[in-house]
Design a protein with these regions (language model features):
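Gram-negative/organellar outer-membrane beta-barrel architecture
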Residues: 1-104, 108, 190-199, 204-215, ...
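C-terminal outer-membrane beta-barrel translocator/porin domains of Gram-negative envelope proteins
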Residues: 85, 94-226, 230-243, 248-250, ...
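A short, hydrophobic secondary-structure junction motif
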Residues: 40-49, 93, 121-130, 149-159, ...
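C-terminal beta-signal and terminal closure region of outer-membrane beta-barrel proteins
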Residues: 248-290
């Protein structure tokens, strides 16, 4: 909704309900550390006030409330048909200030333009946890555990024209956060920010590309076959500043106790080759992904 003010200003309200299910298919998981089944249900509302920033950017002040529900198994050794899930849920409030400049030509698989994005957030809320009754764990439910943290995320994504046939894209992304770990390893990974630079990475779950603090970068050589068709090779590297790791107690192997690893101690990368047909109303792609962890 655009407001009748001297400076162009708009008010944007969003209400979203999301229900995600990650099945037992191993195509979605790359190590047995992550449970074979995860369900995430999210209900959140956002209110944003936007206005121009400098000449070609916009700024937004936002407030949000969300109820996040995670249902998961902490081990794959439990017979799945008889299993019930651990349940973590969160009531979170946040305030944010963001600045964005975006001239990318498309939302998916862009080949020209530039995006610069910076957001600062303050988040506060509570965590509650109920263990699965079939997990044989000695864990007790936890009451309201308060979490508060500051988070800063920056992203630079730009595509340059090298010739009539070739473009080159590059990406840099960084997240800095004071966020604490959750009750257990799986809950901590589920609630950590994820690096999802491709459409495919947005619909699968991979713990190797989740961390509360990380740096990531990428290169995208692009061959333009026609005005609507192009071939691209997207290559990305991901380095958690402090990787989320887990310790398994001997007296209760079901539970993973989370802790932070050493500074910049791990590095993962992913690659995707894709042929993309970009229509005015639809994007069609045929791709092959490679992930190394």
């Amino acid at each position: 909704m655009y407001l009748q003010t001297q400076i162009p200003t708009y008010l944007n309200w969003q209400g979203v309900f999301s229900d995600k299910k990650y099945t037992e298919s191993q195509s979605l998981f790359y190590e047995d550390i992550v449970p074979a089944m995860i369900k995430q249900k999210e209900l959140y509302m956002k209110l944003k006030l936007g206005f121009p920033f400098l000449n070609h950017a916009k700024a937004e002040i936002g407030f949000a409330y969300g109820r996040l529900n995670d249902f998961y198994l902490q081990s794959t050794t439990i017979p799945f048909p008889n299993a019930s899930f651990d349940h973590s849920w969160y009531d979170l409030f946040s305030g944010s200030l963001s600045i964005e400049q975006n001239s990318l030509n498309t939302k998916q698989y862009p080949i020209s333009g530039k995006q610069q994005f910076l957001i600062a957030q303050y988040v506060t809320g509570t965590e509650k946890y109920t263990p699965s009754p079939t997990s044989a764990t000695t864990e007790a439910p936890i009451g309201r555990k308060v979490h508060s943290w500051l988070q800063l995320k920056g992203r630079w994504n730009q595509y340059q024209t090298l010739s009539n046939r070739f473009n080159l894209g590059y990406l840099a992304e960084m997240v800095i956060s004071s966020k604490n770990l959750m009750n257990n390893y799986t809950a901590s990974v589920l609630q950590a920010p994820a690096f999802t630079p491709t459409p495919h990475s947005e619909i699968v779950f991979n713990e190797a590309f989740r961390a509360n603090q990380y740096v990531a970068f990428g290169l995208s050589p692009i061959l333009k076959l026609s005005k609507l068709l192009h071939f691209r090779l997207d290559m990305y590297g991901f380095a958690p500043l402090y990787e989320i790791q887990k310790t398994v107690p001997e007296n209760n192997p079901y539970v993973g106790i989370p802790h932070y690893g050493k500074f910049l101690h791990s590095f993962n990368y992913m690659g995707e080759a894709a042929v993309v047909l970009q229509l005015p109303f639809l994007c069609i792609s045929l791709y092959l992904s490679l992930i190394h962890i």
